[in-house]
Amino acid sequence: MTDRWLVTGAAGMLGRDLVALLRGLNEPVVAITRHDLDITDRLSVRAVVDRHRPTTIVNCAAWTRFGEAEAGESAALLVNGGGARELAAVCRDRSIRLVHLSTDYVFDGTSRRPYAESAVTSPINAYGRTKQAGEQAVLDLLPDDGTIVRTAWLYGRHGMNFIRKMVRLEQLRETVDVVDDQWGQPTWTVDLAQQIVALVRHGASGVFHGTSAGEATWYDLARMTFRLLGADPGRVRPVPSDRIAGGELRPRYTVLGHDAWREAGLTPIRHWTTALTQAFPLLNADES
């Protein structure tokens, strides 16, 4: 049976690439933006689902504004926790597969090795707590048909991100200060979109980490961006997190392990440097 996809958050960086990929594969897909649907509204969620009758929903919708989540956690929780619960509930009632996007920030960052998919979550900030609530709702309501894909440090063509910010700052400043004590995995939205499609086609469920292989600091990522621009990476200066507003609330080490992909018979996402080298001409063209 052909999958019928419904993608929420379809105007976002990942959502746009996922919808474009599915259309390129001639897969039936409905792109839903926040203007089309409030995922916290139960009646609206069920009406949209019943109108389009998808077999798979990918929830890319989220409250991602980190600082605003700290200032108003209840509003972020309504979307990241409550919205996920509403989608999971309708998927349970209609026998629909749900892929829910989550974050590395569900972890506290105290580990010194990549977090396994089964590692205990312990967020240290409001954003992480609200995303943890969404994960739990999906796993509680859809133990067999729910899939959590945690991702991190996303970049892509559609919307502002760290790479595009560095491209602009290289043109505006002689030097750029970048945090060098937070570790993660830069991940191209195109790679993640391909991984989500492979996951659904394979019929796998559970928790997966949708991040690139390898690890880096923001400082490492900024230096590589400068190198790809043909600029001097020495213009990037390392600074500690406590020099950045809100830095104390961000976990230091949230590198994610990828064993679940291999156990499901799937290949994890490639190394972040390989992906960025391929993606960069596309990103830079948009800034020219």
Curated annotation (Swiss-Prot):
Active site positions, chain numbering: 127
**Amino acids binding NADH:** 12-14, 38-39, 62-64, 127, 131
Q: EC number(s) in its UniProt entry?
A: 1.1.1.-
- Give the InterPro entries listed for this entry: dTDP_dehydrorham_reduct (IPR005913), NAD(P)-bd_dom_sf (IPR036291), RmlD-like-bd (IPR029903)
The Swiss-Prot or TrEMBL record lists the needed cofactor(s) as:
Mg(2+)
Q: What remark does the entry make about the cofactor?
A: Binds 1 Mg(2+) ion per monomer.
Which Pfam families does this entry report, sorted A to Z?
RmlD_sub_bind
Record's protein name: dTDP-4-keto-6-deoxy-D-glucose reductase
Protein's organism: Streptomyces niveus (Streptomyces spheroides)
Q: What's the encoding gene here?
A: novS
